[in-house]
Structures are given as structure tokens and as C-alpha cells.
Amino acid sequence: MPTRAELRDHLVRTRIAGDVATSRENNLDHYRSLANRDPYHLFGLTLSDGWSYRDVLALMAKSAGVVADPEHRSGQDTIDPDRTIDAIEAMGERIGQVLAGGRARLMFATGHPTGLLAIHLPLARLAVQHGATLLTPAEGWSYVGHGFGRRRRIRYFGGVAMLDDRGGFVHTHDADPMRAMIAELDGVRPDLVVADHGWAGAAGEAGLPTVGFADSNDPALFVGEAEGKIAVTVPLDDNVLPRYYDPLTAYLVSRVTRAL
């Protein structure tokens, strides 16, 4: 397990945090889209009034560490690695507390299988090792989602829900798959949902205890956290090489076990 200082250096070196690959232009475009209540950027959340573009930018500067100056409109943007680590510690404590209660029920889901699956899978295994049940509702449920015109379905790997498109796991912001999972829970409420993108947003909107990961250009979960619908949101680049997440995952696992 890395120390906090070692993890901080690693996050900056691999651009999980620090000077990230997501451009300032892309970040600001997504903040405007969220302020305009674009469904694609809401991740299944409904927001209270008052979240203007400037409000979203100010929140992202506070929660993720992007540049606060609204006049900085192009070029490099940032994620504060210390905010990332603080959120990892908070997430680890929350997961550990749930597992410590015994016989916990958890759901895992990711809309970024090429990146964040590398974090979800070890967490799911850890949960099982500590007596948790991984809920896997709506496996095989399918729908024609937004913008791609063909049917996709929920498939689980290692207890983690993802979208399958003709044999491949795919990126998605959609909230509909998590809504389908919740509809099939049949009264069995998970003690915690660990997710990202629309999977996390829909869970939080439904009132399920939820922790999640989000990139600097995905402000919805941070707004959801500010409104009390998401318990913890970890800011990070969500699509670096999967092996780059290993030290972060080891640090997170250590925080979970410390809280048990």
C-alpha cells in the first residue's frame, strides 16, 4: 500500500489527478450543459433550482479542484490530488462501515469499463471476502438507449454491472439500466451502491446510499453530493490505463479494512 505522499505523486505522474487530459473547454461545455439540465449530463439526477453555470464551476473548483477562474476558458485544467485522496479516504470509511455491520448487501456498476472496472472489481471481491452479498438484479435486461440505435443489455462480471453491446462492455452515461436494476430489487434494499456515471446518479436519485467516481467533466455527481443524494464522489480521470489505478485501489482497500 502506498503512503498518502506516494499516492499523491502517483496520481500526478499518471494524470489521474493534477494536470489531467480533459481539456478546460470540455469541462466548461459540460458545466453549461448541466446548468441547462441536459439529460445526458444529469446522470439520472434531478437538481434543485439555482445551479447556474457559475454555481457549477464554483462547486467543481471546491470539490474537484478545477481552476476556479471563470476567465480561464481554454487549455489545461486540473484535479486536485489531495481532494482525490480525501474523497478516497471518505469512500473507504463508508464502505468499511457498511461491511462491518455484517451481512451487507452491495451493488456495483460502472459506465467506464475500460478504466474504472479496475477499481470496482477488487472492491467487489473485498466485499464478498467480508461476508457481503453482491446484488445482481436485472441481468439480461435490454433497451435501445440514446444515440446508438441498437439494443444493449445489462451483464455482470465479477458482480459488477455493465452494459454489453454485441459482446463488448461499453461506456455509458445512461441512468436507465440502474433504474431497471432498482425496479427488480423486489424490496431488497442494498446497504450501499458503488458506481459511477448514470448508474450512480440513478441510485442516488432513488434514495439508495451511494458512493461514486467522477471525472472533472462529469459534474452531476458532485452536485448530487452537494444536495445530499450522493454520499461521496471521488474526483479522478476515469479513463487512464487500468494498471494506473492499482495504487489508488490498494490505498482505498486499506481504508476499507481500517474501518472494519
Where are these regions (language model features)?
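Generic hydrophobic alpha-helical segments
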Residues: 91-95, 178-182, 248
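Short, acidic/small-residue loops that bind anionic groups at enzyme active sites
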Residues: 129-142, 206-223
